[in-house]
Amino acid sequence: EDGRGFDVLSFDTQGNPKYIEVKTTKGSAQSPFYLTDNEIAFLDQNRGSYCIYRLYNYVEETNSADCFVLNDHIRGQILLRPTTFQVTIKKT
């Protein structure tokens, strides 16, 4: 279901929600990936229970990848750079 701000809802051992966003690239662990405005807003609202599963070196033929998890102080571990802008024509 798109638009929720995360991909997978899980729970920790105490039953608290854990919101998981999965980001996959064929490139290295440092290859850029994209987060939507909605995903960033959800991350900021759920800092203690949000994590990003970063899959990289993805091989389609074997459906395999390397992985690490960003889950504590995510904003301090990533750089966000705007890459697109919404454009609206002004009324004249």
Positions of the model-derived regions?
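Core nucleotidyl-transferase/polymerase catalytic module
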Residues: 1-3
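Catalytic cores of nucleic-acid endonucleases
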Residues: 22-73
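Short, surface-exposed beta-edge/turn micro-motifs
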Residues: 5-6, 16-17, 48-50
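Acidic, glycine-rich loop-and-strand cores that form catalytic or ligand-binding grooves
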Residues: 13
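Conserved catalytic cores of phosphodiester-cleaving nucleases, focusing on short active-site segments
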Residues: 7-10, 18-24
